[in-house]
């Protein structure tokens, strides 16, 4: 099928297969369609069907709460075309210049628990992938409706294995499926890479990373990229990792290694929302600082007296992301220096 997308100033067209979402079809062909989560959660990929027939796969998607289906509103990530279609979108239409996302097969291996409700796993790919630090992929499993977005923990080019973090969520069918049976050697569909909240050393900026829970995954990729590029030789960095209690924190050894490789220019603070920090430093990983409070509040306190000369990356639950953005802007950070991909 042919899909034509329009806004007030431009029109672009692309082909769409019968079994793929309109969003994925456009992205893999280099059309920069609007999206954030790509899984039905955020609502950013909304469009209006002006002509043609479509099939909405997940009518109850949270991101569709404000749509007007009677006027033809859809989420492109949850919609397949049944004929040639014309869609109206509210954002600019551009051709992607960087690597385009594609569909691959993946095999889950090395699944291991990090905490009571967080696990790490490796995803072995059927074809190599090149991605930027901070990007994510969407996984789909047979028999489980919809896709789930996961940020890469690792960083490299032309890789055939991704490191990912899984957070168990109440009522989450995919996370329950993974946790209950520890699905090693299981196959999944993979679409990516996706995401615009990326780190590029050539921008030559100081960096702040603020993450809640499993949101630390993408920050680990950013830190890996920065350390490999020796970014912290000439630039400062600060990481704020929010968890409920110290027992909920993970990747601490790796975070400690990043501080050791930073020429003294990277600081890492664990923000404990449900526990009083007994000491100012972690007992085992003494390079890591401890603070009590919500992660966005801890970050605001620490950054209050600092010059706003940094790029800030945010990842975590949508409520946490929204609170952090408001806090940063109130503290004087300009919106163009805040980067995040909102999914959760």
Residue ranges and their predicted role:
Residues 1-79, 85, 237-344:
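Reductase modules of NAD(P)H-dependent flavoproteins
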Residues 74-97, 186:
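Short, structured interface segments
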Residues 50-53, 92, 142, 193:
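Short, surface-exposed secondary-structure boundary micro-motifs
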Residues 220-230:
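Histidine-anchored nucleotide/phosphate-binding helix
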Residues 134, 215, 317:
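Short, conserved phosphate/pyrophosphate- and ester-handling motifs at nucleotide-, phospho-/glycolipid
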Residues 100-187, 205, 243-245, 271-275:
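Ferredoxin-reductase
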Residues 192-203:
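A short, basic/flexible loop-to-alpha-helix module at the beginning of a structural domain
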């Amino acid at each position: 099928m042919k899909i034509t997308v329009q806004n007030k100033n431009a029109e672009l067209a692309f082909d769409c297969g019968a079994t793929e979402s309109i969003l994925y079809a456009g992205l893999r062909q280099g059309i920069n369609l609007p999206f954030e989560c790509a899984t039905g959660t955020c609502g950013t990929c909304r469009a209006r069907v002006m002509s043609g027939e479509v099939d909405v796969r997940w009518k109850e998607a949270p991101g569709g709460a404000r749509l007007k289906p009677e006027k033809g509103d859809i989420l492109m990530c949850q919609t397949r075309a049944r004929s040639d279609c014309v869609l109206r979108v509210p954002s600019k239409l551009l051709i992607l210049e960087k690597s385009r996302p594609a569909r691959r097969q993946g095999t889950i291996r090395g699944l291991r628990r990090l905490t009571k409700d967080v696990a790490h796993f490796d995803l072995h790919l059927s074809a190599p992938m090149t991605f930027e630090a901070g990007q994510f992929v969407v996984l789909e499993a047979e028999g489980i409706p919809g896709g789930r977005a996961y940020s890469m923990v690792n960083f490299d080019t032309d890789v055939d294995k991704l490191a990912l973090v899984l957070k168990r969520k109440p009522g989450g069918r995919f996370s329950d499926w993974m946790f209950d049976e520890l699905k090693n050697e299981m196959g999944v569909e993979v679409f990516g890479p996706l995401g615009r909240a990326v780190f590029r050393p050539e921008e030559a900026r100081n960096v702040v990373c603020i993450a809640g829970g499993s949101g630390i995954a993408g920050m680990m990729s950013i830190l890996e990229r920065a350390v490999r590029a020796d970014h912290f030789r000439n630039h400062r960095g600060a990481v704020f990792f929010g968890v409920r209690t110290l027992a909920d924190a993970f990747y601490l050894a790796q975070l400690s290694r990043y501080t050791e490789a930073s020429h003294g220019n990277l600081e890492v603070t664990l923000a404990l929302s449900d526990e009083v920090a007994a000491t100012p430093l972690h007992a085992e990983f003494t390079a890591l600082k401890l603070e009590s409070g919500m992660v966005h509040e801890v970050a605001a306190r620490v950054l209050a007296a600092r010059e706003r000369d940094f790029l800030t990356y945010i990842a975590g639950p949508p409520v946490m992301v929204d609170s952090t953005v408001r806090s940063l802007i109130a503290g004087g950070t300009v919106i163009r220096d805040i980067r995040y991909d909102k999914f959760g």
